[in-house]
């Protein structure tokens, strides 16, 4: 009666009641209080830690903070993780005003208890728990890798679809721009004036021969008065006696004809074929004198025929009029 079942108190050597390893240089530790807690089996003794597990001691435990092996360790009340006494004193400072969190599960009011060495059941249970934790970490890692691959695949698909859409849009825009450029070029070409004279089916320039002959006659009539003024009648008679009769020179008429053709071609280049033909017709009509001056015009025409015959051109004017009084045809022959 009155007997109480309990764990037998472990006898601890006094030298293990204070830090032996010297891992942390802390002056805030109360050595007397620490000794009392160790002797009351509330904290694990401060055994010296080993860096490697000897082959003769397979029951040593590793501290997850300092990675040293000890005969026994403290256990956190929140997550049952092992920790040595020196690491616990470093984590839970007695002069700290804020509550200490568990270094493993981040639970506030971190506290530990000492249960002695682990039994076989506890060790096997810990191994199972560790295996579960490892498997969970592996699954989480695989899930992260799969998520990354899926995200990358979606990104590639979206990029390919957007690139194809942009390429189609660029092709459409390029085609429309090319069509617009072609339309602009064609409109500009149509707006530009033609710098080439109009050519007939026979490969000849479409000039009005009557206008050319009239211009040639005018040019010749302008040249004759100057020659007559500079030459006296005696000189002319003496020159006629000395010179033999010869065919009239065609250099002067041909030169005048070339000048007339050049002038008319230049006018056609500047104002266009249609407008130039109209202007030449108007000029030819203006050059024709009225009925009061027919005698003077006939004299000029006879002179022009004389010089054109010397150049090898036979010009015959045969005008035919229709009922309305308009001119219908003209004849020009070449010898």
From Swiss-Prot:
Region of interest called Disordered, as start-end residue ranges on this chain: 143-203, 224-256, 310-335
Annotated coiled-coil segments of the chain: none
InterPro entries documented for this protein: Sip5/DA2 (IPR039301), Znf_RING (IPR001841)
Name the UniProt record assigns to this protein: E3 ubiquitin-protein ligase DA2L
Organism expressing this protein natively: Arabidopsis thaliana (Mouse-ear cress)
Keyword Metal-binding: yes
Its EC number(s): 2.3.2.27
Pathway: Protein modification; protein ubiquitination
GO molecular function: transferase activity; zinc ion binding
